[in-house]
């Protein structure tokens, strides 16, 4: 009889999901759990993430698009119907409104009969990185740090199995961070948060080691999987040293670097999307091969996320990738296969040294909060991302199917009637608003008023925000009401854009110089310099593309008007009129491009700029691209369009066409 081989326990397996409505998302969750998924990872829509109810004007077109809409406890109960929260491990990707969504989760668990002490899961709750990448911040940095701190202090005392914050290097990589910058900025964020918890006085010295032990990280894993393995080993080394030396953590268990992963979604391509399958598998190796640095939880994107929302079958495929690696291979039968490798050791040391030096530069500015407020970190990320995009454009950084090996057969994966993606029913927004109105009509308005008054008093007075928020959840307060109460007290914030960086070397190349000459010449023909407005309408905060267009446009001679994210169509039209721009470039990655274009055109018409050429970039299916052009969009750009010089020539010629000038060709 053969002795069974001893195998390590697999990581927690999740798929990041949520769309349309709480009911539809609940059905998806229960289906995924039946297929062997071992935890939930909830995606919320943008209004929920930024603190708006579904009927707010800024929520138009965004409801249910990139996640599930949660306006109140009724939605939260529907989301977890037949899912016992006392037995589930739930990760919630939520930041600015994390205190609110956790309060709703606790309230629903209590209604199910569970106690807070039974709950297991994670709130992302890293608002600092929102100022640098995803853009779903609401309040200024200092009040945001206070909210993060309150959640940590509350959960350590009351929900001891909860991970109150996921310090995110994931989004930093997608915003352009190198591995060294990922390490430095994530650990600098952890320092800022742990220092704030300690300074708040909510946790005594005797309990602070428990705080350290509950800090977790959410990490990206890119295609260079050997380097990614080294990055994770460097994270572990640096965290162990930091928690011992700065925070006096003695327990090895409390110092353990605890992290979950989603592999690189923005590295997936629209061109030849079938190649994304092997990309995802290789990226998974970077955070599973090394036992000492293995992820504790993993969620894989679907192969088609560069095209749009994945279907249930696509999410099943992503889950099966994890299961094959964990249960069919011999990965979990061995110790750390990288121990003793001089190559790995040297790479880890180089990453540690580089990250330590960058952390020192952050601390010289007063810490991570101050380095964000000054724009320093954002400029570093925009610079790194610009260098990466230029390397792809030149062909130095090869992306199969995008800038090399572009010959291809037609893919059967995208040949069906649905073009290989899930499309949210346009009725979802209207139906969510109807449910919200019914909920408001049935609740006790006096209880709501009292709960909001208590919340406001708590926010002003400095007490922990969680108990008051849980009372709000039970009273029937809505997401928009909770957030607006805090907006009235803390104010709102606009983060630095980071585009004020030195010109890239490519801006001095022959093609860029030739484009700049034509831009200057056209400006002289029209009597003033050419001016572009780059606009981010709606609630989508993914600004990488807009920033790169702004930087490139500036480098080839255009004057750039870019005021950052979350603009209303009215603000865009007003800025176009006041700034006298020649063309508007819109960026929308949330799937709400049709609604946003309609609203922007309506506003341009009202200010007398109906003639103004407008282009758009984003994750836009071909069928939608045709529709947008029918509505008047001059050009549509998607992630496969990497020739930035070519885009600049397109823009120049659209301006010339608008003024009855002949197009120019730039060699």
Give short role names for the model-derived ranges.
Residues 652-666:
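The C-terminal output helix
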Residues 187-190, 218-220, 225-310, 314-318:
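Glycine-rich anion/phosphate-binding loop at the beta-strand->alpha-helix junction
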Residues 126-129, 144-201, 278-359, 365, ...:
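Mobile "lid/hinge" segments at catalytic clefts and subdomain interfaces of large enzymes
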Residues 10-11, 256-259, 528-530, 607-616:
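Short beta-strand/loop segments at the ligand-binding rim of alpha/beta enzyme cores
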Residues 546-652, 656:
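Cofactor-cradling patches in redox/metallo enzymes
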Residues 1-228, 246, 253-260, 294-301, ...:
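Catalytic alpha/beta active-site cores
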Residues 60-65, 90, 130-139, 174-176, ...:
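Short beta-alpha connecting loops at secondary-structure transitions
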Residues 311-312, 316, 320-323, 327-514, ...:
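Flexible, glycine-rich loop/tail regions that form catalytic "lids" or insertion modules at the edges
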